[in-house]
Amino acid sequence: MKVSDFYFELPEELIAQYPLEKRDSSRLMVLDKKTGEIEHRKFHDILEYLNEGDTLVLNNTRVLPARLIGEKEETGGKIEFLLLKRIEGDKWECLAKPGRKAKVGTVFTFGEGKLKAIVREIGEEGNRIIEFKYDGIFEQVLDELGQMPLPPYIHEKLEDKERYQTVYSKEKGSAAAPTAGLHFTEDLLKEIKDKGVNIAYLTLHVGLGTFRPVKVDDVNNHVMHSEYYHLDKENAELINKTKEAGKRVIAVGTTSSRTLETIGDENGRVREQSGWTDIFIYPGYKFKIVDNLITNFHLPESTLIMLVSALAGQDNIMNAYNTAVKEKYRFFSFGDSMFIK
């Protein structure tokens, strides 16, 4: 299977540069994975497609303001760090721009010295391991000095930081938002619960590998980045009861899907578990837990379009995406939504 099999022509003006004023006013394409039939709705209409006893699985990760702009302590030369993941304590793996300035032992300062970073080592891919020095609580310092790490295809400034967070975000640790969840409002979640639909939570901290292009020709040769996940006992039991009752598990986002499929066993059960996953889901994969999926519209030739193709069928997805382009749906992080039923 070739990566080019997942290519489609996307006009740049369809890449959403800002979120809509109302989260649940985005468009919703409903795709029947059995027939390939397409409906055009509004996101709030998702309520009509959820049944009593179903379980909606949300990723409650919270995006860190992981972009730090500072200067070299000795010379004042500008540097930009993008935090990727915490290694341990105050040590973080990050991207440095320009990399040539970030030599081992170099000290950088941020916010007039409120935060300092020392480069401890350089990784295989050129990523830096840095150690922070500061007074107080790191998360508070980062909230004050850090900026939101918006995806590379968004060029507009984000006026409100919270619009790149889901309304249920809780566990800090992501370098990017689980964007399928951006469409939900607190009112809509209440309406969903009132209908008798269960809501389960898990955590997967989204890494920047999400935006890395696939650099091989053959899909089988691609190696995924690893991301940290956690599912607790209470939510695992809720998901298992749903499967036992013959009801549907509906994942919100590719991150929730990858977590559930990492943990799920051959009998369609999950258990309390934490760890790192590098699961790569593409056509031919048999889903163990996820029945349906709410997701955004993804980049051509990305691992995410491969995942949705595994669930809905490659022909169905490519047809749906070409229809979305024709109907001028908004794409990517701040774009419209798809429900694979």
From Swiss-Prot:
Q: What is its EC number?
A: 2.4.99.17
Give the metabolic or biological pathway: tRNA modification; tRNA-queuosine biosynthesis
Please tell me where this protein is predominantly located: cytoplasm
What GO cellular component term, any one, is given? cytoplasm
Alphabetized InterPro entries for the sequence: QueA, QueA_dom1, QueA_dom2, QueA_sf
**EC primary class:** transferase
A single GO molecular-function term is:
S-adenosylmethionine:tRNA ribosyltransferase-isomerase activity
Q: Which terms are listed as keywords in the entry? A: Cytoplasm, Queuosine biosynthesis, S-adenosyl-L-methionine, Transferase
Q: Where in the cell is it found?
A: Cytoplasm
Which SUPFAM superfamilies does the entry link to?
QueA-like
Gene Ontology terms: biological process? queuosine biosynthetic process; tRNA wobble guanine modification
> What's the family?
Belongs to the QueA family.
| Function recorded in the entry | Transfers and isomerizes the ribose moiety from AdoMet to the 7-aminomethyl group of 7-deazaguanine (preQ1-tRNA) to give epoxyqueuosine (oQ-tRNA).
Protein's name in the database: S-adenosylmethionine:tRNA ribosyltransferase-isomerase
Q: Which organism is it from?
A: Clostridium perfringens (strain SM101 / Type A)
Q: Provide the organism lineage as a comma list.
A: Bacteria, Bacillati, Bacillota, Clostridia, Eubacteriales
Q: Which gene encodes it?
A: queA
